[in-house]
Amino acid sequence: MTERTLSGIGVTPLSGVGTVVWYRPDADLPEPPAPVDVDAEAELARFEDARAAAEDELEAERERTAERVGEEEAAVFDAHVQFLNDPQITDGVSDAIESGLPAEHAVQETFTEFVEQFENMGGRMGERADDLRDVRDRLVRVLSDGERVDLSSLPEGSVVVAERLTPSDTAQLDPERVAGFVTVTGGRTSHAAIFARSLALPAIVGVGEELQSVEDGTEVVVDGESGDLVVDPSDERKEAAAAAADVDIRHEAVETADGVDIEVAANIGTLADLGPAVDRGADGVGLFRTEFLFLDRESPPDEDEQYEAYVEALESFDGGRVVVRTLDIGGDKPVPYLDLPDEENPFLGERGIRRSLGPDADLFETQVRALLRAAASADGANLSVMLPLVSTVEELRAGRERFESVAADLDAEGVANELPEFGIMVETPAAAFMADQFAPHVDFFSIGTNDLAQYVMAAERGNERVSELGDYRQPAVLRAIDATVSAAEGEDCWVGMCGEMAGDPDLTELLVGLGLDELSMSAVTVPQVKAAVAETDTADARDLAERVLQADTKAEVAEILTLDQ
């Protein structure tokens, strides 16, 4: 066969070689019949039962995904529960049933109308149509007593090819068996793309209808960086792809071309993330999210359970720095043992350090005790701790005083402990504006660009209609980063970054130029960012940063960065 290439959007900087396995889940969905004489009351009851069963499935799936992939990725299933219970949708299904449709057909018809509405909006809103499809297909399957297709045990070396992959589909994929996936539709910010990065899977989306010409069993090369799908590749192409898949991972510290050390660390959402982070060459952990210890359970973890988790992270990196973020939970997450307020906008409400110094003070003290003990667990244990959502000097001082008072308590009890390196997340405009006042009181700042962009631009992260505003390439966001780094200069205070921006190799030179000392990201991009650091000259990087900071618009920023590539 002659080698040919199809092009799409590469979403992971990884390559894979394997055999096509087509996944066509829509084939078994029933076509809606003309309205018939049905027992509307019985069908409505079936629909309600199916909703309850689907919600139970989603909660279980959320828990599995949080454990296997990460808490942030698992949050997509919270959105699915919202769709499942959305009054507009449920009322539409009820109306369709009362007009004479059986429940499964009413679900299919109503959800499909909403899917089309989302697709017509385009952009990121269009990508969210896959979430609606996922909920629709789940309900239809439950109503039809259908079996769920199992993607978790595919033959080794499979390349999954599909019209689209929903979050439920992608969460099943096993990186040990699957060599990658390719879809007809989709974009860089789709949930399938996000899961691919978290699972370290080569992936291409948005190839278009030409992908339908690739048959089951065909050998392919998936280049997740360029977006090229090579069909019937030559032996030379396969060997080159296999070599590319065997990434030259640096397992030692990296420095710029002119000798400046930059730490490249991994973000950790569960203990299962530690192994891949080590394997991909992370120097340490730049963000250890502790929420997974507290979620999906009926009571909080005790001191010893937390201690063991923190020690496991420290031992995984054997002297590499592990930065733990204290509990950051608010009204957006269901925690049965906490009295969380029902807030209109929980992201601007009682969360993070606000709860730790208030209603969750006892929980915070237990966490602090575990952290102080972990810091003294072994010679060379390199633990740092940071507080989330700090906005005032009073919060910072109170948080630090809590660590010092708990350390005194442990000393009095004769329990080995050590005060770790202490810092704060910079994710609110207040923290960026007040960074010069915070710097004398901390050992480090960690800039959370996802939330910083959201709060600086007043553009909710989950609201697709304003997603372009909440981009970290916005000049206001870049200037907030620059202000934070500038405030740390002259103080014994290093500056890291743990948002999505840190893991973009195309932005590494800019971030070095802005003065970042540490970059933390999903483990999958660690090798590429290390390679980008090694190619960066700090003088050139500072020049790039100065030019970017003069830009008035996001488009100007993008143009400067493109010209510099």
Curated annotation (Swiss-Prot):
Enzyme class comes to transferase
The record's GO CC annotations read:
cytoplasm
Q: Which reaction does it catalyse?
A: L-histidyl-[protein] + phosphoenolpyruvate = N(pros)-phospho-L-histidyl-[protein] + pyruvate
Extract the GO molecular function terms from the UniProt entry. kinase activity; metal ion binding; phosphoenolpyruvate-protein phosphotransferase activity
Q: Does the keyword Hydrolase apply?
A: no
Q: EC number(s) on record?
A: 2.7.3.9
Per its UniProt record, what PROSITE patterns does this chain match?
A: PEP_ENZYMES_2 (PS00742)
User: Where does the protein end up?
Assistant: Cytoplasm
This protein's source sits in the domain of life called Archaea
Q: What is its main location?
A: cytoplasm
For whether the record's keyword set contains Isomerase, the answer is no
Q: What induces it?
A: Expression is highly up-regulated in presence of fructose.
What free text does the record give on domains? Answer: The N-terminal domain contains the HPr binding site, the central domain the pyrophosphate/phosphate carrier histidine, and the C-terminal domain the pyruvate binding site.
Additional detail: The reaction takes place in three steps, mediated by a phosphocarrier histidine residue located on the surface of the central domain. The two first partial reactions are catalyzed at an active site located on the N-terminal domain, and the third partial reaction is catalyzed at an active site located on the C-terminal domain. For catalytic turnover, the central domain swivels from the concave surface of the N-terminal domain to that of the C-terminal domain.
Q: State the oligomer form and interacting partners.
A: Homodimer.
Q: What does this protein do?
A: General (non sugar-specific) component of the phosphoenolpyruvate-dependent sugar phosphotransferase system (sugar PTS). This major carbohydrate active-transport system catalyzes the phosphorylation of incoming sugar substrates concomitantly with their translocation across the cell membrane. Enzyme I transfers the phosphoryl group from phosphoenolpyruvate (PEP) to the phosphoryl carrier protein (HPr).
Q: Output this protein's name.
A: Phosphoenolpyruvate-protein phosphotransferase
Q: Identify the species of origin.
A: Haloferax volcanii (strain ATCC 29605 / DSM 3757 / JCM 8879 / NBRC 14742 / NCIMB 2012 / VKM B-1768 / DS2) (Halobacterium volcanii)
Which gene specifies this protein's sequence?
A: ptsI
